[in-house]
């Protein structure tokens, strides 16, 4: 996924060799700069992996919450029905058949 978008890897940057010209860049300066770029790439890759794992974890949590939400109303309706039935039975017992005559 990410490999399709990124053109260079840390290893490719490390192994890249530049041709030297008559008045080329200082090789030491280029090497130091490339070392910094490599460290940044490695840091970014670690952060991306961490965020992908976190994203996967949160996606699973969301799926579980949605599934639980789908099941919850069915349990609630059954519970409400049971409570109403018990209340009706208690009223019959306490007040007798006077309410239902």
From Swiss-Prot:
Gene Ontology CC, one term: cytoplasm
Protein's job: Divisome component that associates with the complex late in its assembly, after the Z-ring is formed, and is dependent on DivIC and PBP2B for its recruitment to the divisome. Together with EzrA, is a key component of the system that regulates PBP1 localization during cell cycle progression. Its main role could be the removal of PBP1 from the cell pole after pole maturation is completed. Also contributes to the recruitment of PBP1 to the division complex. Not essential for septum formation.
Family: Belongs to the GpsB family.
Residue stretches in coiled coil: 34-71
The protein's name: Cell cycle protein GpsB
InterPro entries found in the cross-reference section: Cell_cycle_GpsB, DivIVA_domain, DivIVA_fam
Lineage: Bacteria, Bacillati, Bacillota, Bacilli, Bacillales
Encoding gene (name): gpsB
Subcellular location: Cytoplasm
Subunit structure: Forms polymers through the coiled coil domains. Interacts with PBP1, MreC and EzrA.
Disulphide linkage map: none
Matches recorded under PANTHER family: CELL CYCLE PROTEIN GPSB, CELL DIVISION PROTEIN DIVIVA
Sorted UniProt keywords: Cell cycle, Cell division, Cell shape, Coiled coil, Cytoplasm
A Gene Ontology biological process term: regulation of cell shape
């Amino acid at each position: 996924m990410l490999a399709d978008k990124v053109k260079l890897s840390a290893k490719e940057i490390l192994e890249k060799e530049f041709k030297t010209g008559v008045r080329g860049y200082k090789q030491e300066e280029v090497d130091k700069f490339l070392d910094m770029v490599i460290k940044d790439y490695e840091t970014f890759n670690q952060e991306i992996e961490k965020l992908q794992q976190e994203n996967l974890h949160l996606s699973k949590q969301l799926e579980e919450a949605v599934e639980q939400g789908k099941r919850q109303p069915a349990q609630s309706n059954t519970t409400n029905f049971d409570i109403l039935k018990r209340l009706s039975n208690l009223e019959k017992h306490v007040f007798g058949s006077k309410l239902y005559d």
